[in-house]
């Protein structure tokens, strides 16, 4: 029945433990996280708020899925290997992959859950691809975010040197 589904925009989804988790997290944070990626995209692009970067792991192949409001294709391979065509990317840019499915409509609560979907505690998140892609906790590949941090810093090394006093 309809009580087993919920709607975001024009899309309907099944209520499961993931839905219950997101609902409770929203309640516990006074609904401040109940926004969509598109709601802070402009502020991030203008550097009014920090850039949020979320990671998940694609269960089928172990690739990292990078979620952000800004283009992240530069994060798909280590910086030193970006020009090496013999090495395939080991990550996927969520917004680029789902460009036809309104990726900026993703709720921040869902991005947080995708980043922290620990097996058996929460169900994997199933994404609208063919074949279906399911993702889980990013900790499988990069529990502390070191890989993502180093890739990001490597890509912006020159900019950081020219425009900041450094990175702690």
What are these regions (language model features)?
Residues 1-168:
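Catalytic domains of lipid- and phosphate-ester/thioester hydrolases
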């Amino acid at each position: 029945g309809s009580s087993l589904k919920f709607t975001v925009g024009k899309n309907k989804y099944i209520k499961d433990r993931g839905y219950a988790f997101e609902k409770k997290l929203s309640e516990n944070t006074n609904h401040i996280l109940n926004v969509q990626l598109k709601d802070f995209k402009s502020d991030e692009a203008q550097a009014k708020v920090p850039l949020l970067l979320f990671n998940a792991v694609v269960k089928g192949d172990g690739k990292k899925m990078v979620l952000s409001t800004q283009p992240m294709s530069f994060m798909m391979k280590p910086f030193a290997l970006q020009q090496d065509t013999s090495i395939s990317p080991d990550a996927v840019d969520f917004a680029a992959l789902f460009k036809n499915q309104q990726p900026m409509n993703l709720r921040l609560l869902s991005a947080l859950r995708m980043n922290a979907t620990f097996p058996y505690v929460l169900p994997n998140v199933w994404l609208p691809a063919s074949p279906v892609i399911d993702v889980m906790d990013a900790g499988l590949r990069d529990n502390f975010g070191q890989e993502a941090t180093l890739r990001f810093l490597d890509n912006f090394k020159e900019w950081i040197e020219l425009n900041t006093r450094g990175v702690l």
